Design a protein with these regions (language model features):
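Charged, compositionally biased N-terminal leader segments and the immediate start
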Residues: 1-36
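N-terminal leader/targeting peptides and immediately adjacent processing regions
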Residues: 25, 30-55
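C-terminal modules of long, charged coiled-coil scaffolds in eukaryotic assembly complexes
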Residues: 147-212
Length: 212
């Protein structure tokens, strides 16, 4: 389970609740609509048994229609609930990737300021910080690599340093937020607009579950 899977689980629960409620009420409304069409209320001479069935069919139809319309009117609120999940997710990402003085590695900082590091050594320092998920040091190493890249003695060294700098720029959690926006929030809105996608939610969400 990924670091931010809690928010995917919350989104899944909201989608399941929303799509199930909509699907069930729509199905019941359509069934009541068919029953009403089969036994319409008639004026004039009809049997008591038919009159009772027709009246019940009409009442069932009106009740099912009202429930269905209520569910449809409530869909914008579901969007608001997804927006709240996203807000919590963004806050969690910001906290996870925030610079933390407690994570400063003074020995590595001294090396970065010494001027003796070769491009490959920047790369090794970055790999070590990434392994430790030390985002404070990742960003510091990246910033220093970007600062010295243009001074590299070779084009190969410059390319290595720029690659290290790029890895640090991606260590702010932005990729996670973009993945949630596209793979969760936007997908949910598309499903709300197009109920035929409801049954595909699990399949379409799987890549995001794996990523987060």
């Amino acid at each position: 389970m990924g670091t931010f899977n809690e928010f995917v689980t919350r989104a899944d629960a909201l989608a399941d609740e929303t799509f199930t409620e909509y699907t069930v009420t729509k199905r019941r409304f359509e069934a009541a609509e068919r029953k009403r069409a089969e036994t319409p209320v008639k004026h004039g001479l009809v049997s008591a048994e038919y009159a009772v069935r027709a009246a019940k069919a009409e009442a069932d139809y009106l009740e099912a229609r009202e429930k269905y319309e209520t569910v449809k009117r409530g869909l914008p609120e579901k969007s608001s609930q997804m927006a709240a999940i996203r807000a919590d997710f963004v806050a969690a990402v910001a906290s996870h990737f925030a610079a933390d003085p407690a994570k400063l590695d003074k020995a590595t900082l001294a090396l970065l300021e010494s001027g003796i590091l070769k491009p490959g050594e920047y790369e090794r320092l970055m790999a070590s910080a990434e392994k430790d998920e030390n985002f404070t040091m990742i960003r510091l190493i990246a910033a220093k690599a970007a600062e010295v890249a243009d001074k590299a003695p070779t084009r190969e060294g410059e390319a290595i340093l720029k690659a290290v700098a790029m890895r640090g720029r991606n260590a702010d959690g932005g990729d996670y937020i973009r993945a949630f926006d596209v793979g969760v929030a936007s997908l949910f809105e598309r499903c709300l607009r197009n109920p035929s996608l409801y049954s595909s939610w699990d399949m379409l969400m799987q890549p995001v579950r794996d990523a987060l």
